[in-house]
């Protein structure tokens, strides 16, 4: 691209939105085929294409923002608004799951035995693994804030250490959640309780994996001297997203694990 003589956001022609859309189509189609037919071909294809798209698109944005200087103050302002709108859309996404949960639990139908949890369902103890998960995510919220303050104050080593700790806590949360799913006394097929529990907590788990990936990219960029104390919006966006994931978990814990049990 030729040098631009203005400060505004002019996007270069890019194939990655298209490949990302194709990857999303393959992933959803692959899931729909995997459940009834136990075939992983389409799902694997979608995952590979998604990973390639993520790598290439992130590389392009890092190049534009870090080395070509395209992320001027007006562009950063636009990116901030974009991230705020994205998180707002995610709030409404999770609102649907909470709506389904409260719709089912506040007025249980006779088919559920007129009670919540439904007859025959043994809920998980909210004061065991779920409480540990809450502590892990709250601790990761503290460490990501520590990383942010370290970057703003130019404390490079502290930023790397705190960011590494945040990512490790994120992966530990994912591991605990996977163990909980494996040992749960009910499944996604166990009526409305099973489906609302696994869909809500499952999508939250997916968001934790996405957030951990986002922070891992930020860690690599911090190691490679991409962030300065004034110019680090990539990290800020990841931190906002991580705090959003934290807050959603608190609502899930209070609603589904504690009150719902």
Curated annotation (Swiss-Prot):
Spans within the Mitochondrial matrix topological domain: 1-15, 67-72, 153-155, 224-232
Side Mitochondrial intermembrane, residues: 35-40, 106-128, 184-190, 257-261
Ranges annotated as spanning the membrane: 16-34, 41-66, 73-105, 129-152, 156-183, 191-223, 233-256
Alphabetized GO MF terms: cytochrome-c oxidase activity
Xref: SUPFAM superfamilies: Cytochrome c oxidase subunit III-like (SSF81452)
Keyword Transmembrane helix: yes
Translocase in keyword set: yes
Disulfide bonds: none
GO biological process, alphabetically ordered: mitochondrial electron transport, cytochrome c to oxygen
Enzyme Commission designation: 7.1.1.9
A GO cellular component entry from the record: mitochondrial inner membrane
Family from the record: Belongs to the cytochrome c oxidase subunit 3 family.
Described purpose of this protein according to its UniProt entry: Component of the cytochrome c oxidase, the last enzyme in the mitochondrial electron transport chain which drives oxidative phosphorylation. The respiratory chain contains 3 multisubunit complexes succinate dehydrogenase (complex II, CII), ubiquinol-cytochrome c oxidoreductase (cytochrome b-c1 complex, complex III, CIII) and cytochrome c oxidase (complex IV, CIV), that cooperate to transfer electrons derived from NADH and succinate to molecular oxygen, creating an electrochemical gradient over the inner membrane that drives transmembrane transport and the ATP synthase.
Self-association and partners: Component of the cytochrome c oxidase (complex IV, CIV), a multisubunit enzyme composed of 14 subunits. The complex is composed of a catalytic core of 3 subunits MT-CO1, MT-CO2 and MT-CO3, encoded in the mitochondrial DNA, and 11 supernumerary subunits COX4I, COX5A, COX5B, COX6A, COX6B, COX6C, COX7A, COX7B, COX7C, COX8 and NDUFA4, which are encoded in the nuclear genome.
Protein name: Cytochrome c oxidase subunit 3
Species this protein is from: Tetraodon nigroviridis
Upper classification of the organism: Eukaryota, Metazoa, Chordata, Craniata, Vertebrata
Gene: mt-co3
């Amino acid at each position: 691209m030729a040098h631009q003589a203005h400060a505004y956001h002019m996007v270069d022609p890019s194939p990655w939105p298209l490949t990302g859309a194709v990857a999303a189509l393959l992933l959803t189609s692959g899931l729909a085929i995997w459940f009834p037919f136990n075939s992983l071909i389409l799902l694997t294809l979608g995952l590979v294409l998604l990973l390639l798209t993520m790598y290439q698109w992130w590389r392009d944005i890092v190049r534009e923002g870090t080395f070509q200087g395209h992320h001027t103050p007006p562009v950063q302002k636009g990116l901030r608004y974009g991230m705020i709108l994205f998180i707002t859309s995610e709030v409404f996404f999770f609102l649907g799951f909470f709506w389904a949960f409260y719709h089912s639990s506040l007025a249980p139908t006779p088919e559920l035995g007129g009670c919540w949890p439904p007859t025959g369902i043994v809920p998980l103890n909210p004061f065991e693994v779920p409480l540990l998960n809450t502590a892990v995510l709250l601790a990761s919220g503290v460490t990501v804030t520590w990383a942010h303050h370290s970057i703003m104050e130019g404390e490079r080593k502290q930023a790397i250490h705190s960011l590494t700790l945040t990512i490790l806590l994120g992966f530990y949360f994912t591991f605990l959640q996977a163990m909980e799913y494996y040992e749960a006394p009910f499944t996604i097929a166990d009526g409305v309780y099973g489906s609302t529990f696994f869909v809500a907590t499952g999508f939250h788990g997916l968001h934790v994996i996405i957030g951990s990936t986002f922070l891992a990219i930020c860690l690599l960029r911090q190691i490679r001297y991409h962030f300065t104390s004034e110019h680090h919006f990539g990290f800020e966006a990841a931190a906002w997203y991580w705090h959003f994931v934290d807050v959603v978990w608190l609502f899930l814990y209070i609603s589904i694990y504690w009150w719902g049990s």
